[in-house]
UniProtKB/Swiss-Prot annotation:
Its main location: cytoplasm. It is found in: Cytoplasm. Its EC number is 2.1.3.3. Reversibly catalyzes the transfer of the carbamoyl group from carbamoyl phosphate (CP) to the N(epsilon) atom of ornithine (ORN) to produce L-citrulline. PANTHER family: ORNITHINE CARBAMOYLTRANSFERASE, MITOCHONDRIAL (PTHR45753), ORNITHINE TRANSCARBAMYLASE, MITOCHONDRIAL (PTHR45753:SF3). This is Ornithine carbamoyltransferase. Keywords: Amino-acid biosynthesis, Arginine biosynthesis, Cytoplasm, Transferase. It catalyses: carbamoyl phosphate + L-ornithine = L-citrulline + phosphate + H(+). InterPro entries: Asp/Orn_carbamoyltranf_P-bd (IPR006132), Asp/Orn_carbamoylTrfase (IPR006130), Asp/Orn_carbamoylTrfase_sf (IPR036901), Asp_carbamoyltransf_Asp/Orn-bd (IPR006131), Orn/put_carbamltrans (IPR002292), OTCase_ArgI (IPR024904). One of its GO terms (biological process) is arginine biosynthetic process via ornithine. It comes from the Bacteria. Belongs to the aspartate/ornithine carbamoyltransferase superfamily. OTCase family. It comes from Nitratidesulfovibrio vulgaris (strain ATCC 29579 / DSM 644 / CCUG 34227 / NCIMB 8303 / VKM B-1760 / Hildenborough).
Length: 300
């Protein structure tokens, strides 16, 4: 049976820490390997991306493999044929599927019916590669994650969901602020709390950010939600990370954003360009974390 990375929970506690440590080691040593030598990874992107495509293509090459990239027009996941058929066919041609799509159910079906590893490069429900990369970005600076307080300010979107998942395996405190009606997945939150995750929810961004060591946000309208832009701008009034709000965090706090950022909406230009901003380190760490994840799915 192939190993999949469809969500952070696929790693389990031991796997999550193993991948985190391995990603740091790969970064520190400039690792190049042969794990994917002779293997072909199919990148299936229904949602366009700059960082995700480049970082995954480079990651595969650093591990000795090659890639085939399928555009949204070419992939047609579930439109021209059943997903289960697509999964079986691609499994006969290539060695791994790296999928960036809308519904999580598509990722899960590809994993269920294919015979090769499936890696979640983003869905509407989760962004596990990004959040694992963000944990790496914190871990580099604060190896004792039990001393870390993370603030999430904004939408209860796929990023928020994956942060909740990460809190199940890593011992940081997670304070999250959302406007009413924009909460994260309730069932996932329940699972995390039952697992002992230290997660606290509020409507007040000031309360969530007070004393935080790492301050996170994301766009207010994700891909596919453009028609909701005006309504969301009104709902998220007061949730913009500006100098005043950032000033409530820990004196040495760092600002994080998965990018692309809508400057002037969820974050000001002042904060993005400040010494507190570590968004470019986050972007780089996608490469190292994805190499570690690919190695994990291909290692018994």
């Amino acid at each position: 049976m192939p190993k999949h990375f469809t969500r952070i929970r696929d790693l389990g506690f031991e796997g999550a820490w193993k991948v985190l440590e391995r990603a740091k080691e790969m970064k520190d040593t400039g690792y190049r390997g042969r794990t994917l030598e002779g293997k072909v990874a199919t990148l299936i992107f229904e949602k366009a991306s700059t960082r995700t495509r480049i970082s995954f293509e480079v990651a595969v090459r650093h591990l000795g493999g090659t890639t085939i990239f399928m555009t949204p027009a070419e992939s047609q996941l579930g439109r021209s044929e059943p997903l289960r058929d697509t999964a079986r066919v691609i499994s006969r041609y290539t060695d791994c599927m790296i999928v960036r799509t809308f519904g999580q159910a598509k990722i899960d079906e590809l994993a269920s019916f294919g015979s090769i590893p499936v890696v979640n490069a983003l869905t509407d429900e989760g962004h596990p590669c990004q959040v694992m990369s963000d944990v790496l970005t914190m871990y580099e600076r604060t190896p004792d994650l039990s001393q870390v307080r993370v603030a999430w300010i904004g939408d209860g979107n796929n990023m928020a969901n994956s942060w909740i998942e990460a809190a199940m395996y890593f011992p940081f405190e997670l304070f999250m602020a959302f406007p009413e009606g924009y909460e994260p997945d309730r069932q996932l939150l329940g699972l995390a709390l039952e697992a002992g995750a230290k997660i606290f929810l509020t409507r007040d961004p000031h309360m969530a950010i007070d004393g935080a060591h790492y301050v996170n946000t994301d766009v207010w309208a994700s891909m596919g939600q453009e028609e909701e832009q005006k309504r969301r701008e009104a709902a998220f009034k007061g949730f913009c990370i500006d100098g005043a709000l950032m000033g409530r965090a820990h004196p040495d706090a760092k600002f994080m954003h998965c990018l692309p950022a809508h400057r002037g909406e969820e974050v000001t230009d002042e904060v993005m360009e400040s010494p507190a901003s570590i968004v470019w380190d986050q972007a780089e760490n996608r490469l190292h974390m994805q190499k570690a994840i690919l190695e994990w799915v291909f290692t018994e």
